[in-house]
Curated annotation (Swiss-Prot):
The chain crosses the membrane at residues 486-506. Residues 386-397 have a biased composition (Polar residues). Residues 1-485 are cytoplasmic. InterPro entries: Cent_Immune-Sig_Mod (IPR051176). Adapter protein that plays essential roles in both innate and adaptive immunity. Plays a crucial role in the regulation of thymocyte development. Mechanistically, mediates TCR-stimulated activation through recruiting MAP2K1/MEK1 to the Golgi and, thereby, facilitating the interaction of MAP2K1/MEK1 with its activator BRAF. This is TRAF3-interacting JNK-activating modulator. Residues 507-513 are extracellular. GO terms for molecular function: zf-TRAF domain binding. Residues 266-488 form a coiled coil. Residues 17-31, 69-79 have a biased composition (Basic and acidic residues). Residues 1-96, 130-171, 381-402 are annotated as: Disordered. GO terms for cellular component: endoplasmic reticulum membrane; Golgi membrane; lysosomal membrane; mitochondrial membrane; mitochondrial outer membrane; plasma membrane.
Amino acid sequence: MISSDSRSSPGLARWAESYEAKCERRQETRENRRRRRNETTCRQPGKVLRTQHKERLQGARQLQFLKRRNLEEEKKGQAREQGPSSKTDGGTGQVSILKESLPGANKASFPGQQETGISSEVFPALHHSSSGIQRDLGGHHASHGRAFPPQDSDIKKPHRQHRGTQTKAEEALPTIKNDASQQTNCGVAVLDKDIIQLSEYLKEALHRELILKKKMVILQDLLPALIRASDSSWKGQLNEDKLKGKLRSLENQLYTCLQKHSPWGMKKVLLEMEDQRSSYEQKAKASLQKVLEEKMCAEQQLQRAQLSLALAEQKCQEWKSQYEALKEDWRTLGDQHRELESQLHVLQSKLQGADSRDSQMSQALQLLENEHQELQTKLESLQGDGEQQSSETQDLQDQLKKSEEEKQALVSKVQQLQSLLQNQSLQLQEQEKLLKKDQGLPVWNPKLSLDEVKPEGTRKEKEEELRDQLQKETFQLQVKENELQCGQWLPVLMVVIATALAVFLANKGNLVI
């Protein structure tokens, strides 16, 4: 059963469309995508030509280097180890096509050369053209072998699922036993097996379409190389025709020369040509020696450059490590800078608080100075009052002495009164004991005479009077003691105030200093 894809149908209208409409819409989107031009910044023609030219030059240099170093056998062994996957069909096909299109490039046998025996060194243009074509073919083959190895391997050996045109529904779904069916919007019943087969066919078609797109991309990349190869073959054929014409003209000239000149003259000409040939060979040997020397120098320079490159890489790594260390130091310094900035803000806030406190302290100092002046005035007034109070204290001391004498007299009187009270209390206790004894007798007359009652009443009155006198005298003594205490504390207070003022003035002098 095909589930509706939420990514392909974001709107509510697509939910209501039929299966055929969905298929048509998807086919249209595929066609639109397929018709797009597959040109990007990495597939620009000028850039491709430049890269291919560079790769061609590099491949030719590498081949010469390998020939001189005798490293072709190692390269063949590596190619054998890589297996047949590295050998692409596109490259071999291209080389075979170009070889077929150039029939005269490799067949460089001319009748004039066989008859006259002239060596091929006299005509180097033909060899240069054929070697250039072969280099072009090798460069194209190498560039395409490097650029598209996985795609060519896919084309050579496709997967088994891509070979067939149909898939077996029984192998895909072995668990389905009952043929279930579904009803479409038109009312036609369709089996689930058919729907699954259709979905598999669609998947297979999409996969084949992707493979065809890849093949089209590869062919598009191979097309400019084939065009260039055809141009080079056409130019080679033109050069070959030109060379053939030159050879014919030279043969005609030689024939005319043979008819005009004698064999002795021809021998002289041949001797001169041999001398020229030997001189040319010597010059060629000298040039080859120079080239070999230049090659050795270039190899030495290359080795030096490689050594300098290795040293530069080591230095680069060292600089990288130093850069990373400096980066970490910079981060730590940044953190420290931020911490110091935060501390500076805190100190600025503290300084502002200290300034505000300083202003408050200055205001408080002015207030204290004002209070000091007021206290000085008060001290002067208090000193005058102290002199008066000293005279008053002397008077109070005299009064205190008098009051102490009176107090001693009163104390003696109180002691006498207390002794009298004790005696009276003892007498009363004895009388109570006697009364209790009289009550215990069998005959008791409760009536008392007036003479006995009166002394008891007089005693009670006397006791009350004595108590009142004691209370009055004690109250007077307490009042006098309080007055004496207040009189004693006044000079003490004066002394304390004077010491406080002296301490304040001393502290003020220290602050001013």
